[in-house]
């Protein structure tokens, strides 16, 4: 994990990531989206880049450091889902393979807002599975919140919310 993370920090930002970082910086400077700057992406993209800059400063590697942190968290959720679906070896194998696959995909995949949305969706799916297994309103509420966070990066992923609700009603 450490080697993959360090290698990921050396990848240059993609052109999209340069633009998103600039917009995140503008947010930190007090500019207002859609008035002071405009892009076709939703505000979650800029907000996460602003958070990366706030945490790691204005550096070429700031977004990759923050993205790899998000990726590491989502990898834990995915490993547990793999364990539930296919056993403990699947969970352990995913933790070994995921960083190599993610970093090896290069900057046109890793760190893109599609992948960030996917990281939120993996966590949402984990909470959804827990909601189906256990009682309480916290589990589905967390799943819905994470789907909302994913939608702020990639709005089309919102189709999953009604599908997961239908699946819960079916059980």
What spans do the regions from the language model cover?
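Short helix- or helix-capping micro-motifs
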Residues: 1, 92-103, 122, 126, ...
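Transmembrane signal-anchor helices characteristic of membrane glycosylation enzymes that use polyprenol
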Residues: 1-17
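Extracytosolic helix-loop segments that constitute the early lumenal/periplasmic catalytic or substrate-binding loops
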Residues: 18-38, 43-51, 55
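Loop-to-helix entry region of an early transmembrane alpha helix in multi-pass inner-membrane enzymes
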Residues: 43, 47, 57-76
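Transmembrane-helix signature of polytopic, membrane-embedded enzymes
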Residues: 75-102, 118-119, 135-138
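Membrane-interface transmembrane helices that cradle and orient dolichyl/undecaprenyl
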Residues: 83, 124-142, 168-170
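Short acidic/glycine- and proline-prone juxtamembrane loop motifs at membrane-interface regions
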Residues: 109-117
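Membrane-interface alpha helices of multi-pass inner-membrane proteins
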Residues: 138-155, 160-167
């Amino acid at each position: 994990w450490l080697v993959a993370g360090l290698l990921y920090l050396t990848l240059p930002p993609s052109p999209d990531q340069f633009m998103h970082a600039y917009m995140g910086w503008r947010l930190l400077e007090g500019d207002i989206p859609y008035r002071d700057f405009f892009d076709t992406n939703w505000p979650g993209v800029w907000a996460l880049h602003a958070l990366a800059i706030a945490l790691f400063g204005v550096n070429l590697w700031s977004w990759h450091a923050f993205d790899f942190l998000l990726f590491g968290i989502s990898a834990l959720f995915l490993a547990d889902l793999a364990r539930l679906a296919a056993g403990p070896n699947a969970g352990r194998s995913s933790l070994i393979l995921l960083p190599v696959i993610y970093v090896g995909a290069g900057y046109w995949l890793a760190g893109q807002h599609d992948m960030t949305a996917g990281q939120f969706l993996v966590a949402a799916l984990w909470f959804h599975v827990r909601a189906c297994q256990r009682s309480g309103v916290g589990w589905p509420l967390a799943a819905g919140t994470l789907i909302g966070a994913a939608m702020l990066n990639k709005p089309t992923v919102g189709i999953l919310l009604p599908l997961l609700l239908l699946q819960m009603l079916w059980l």
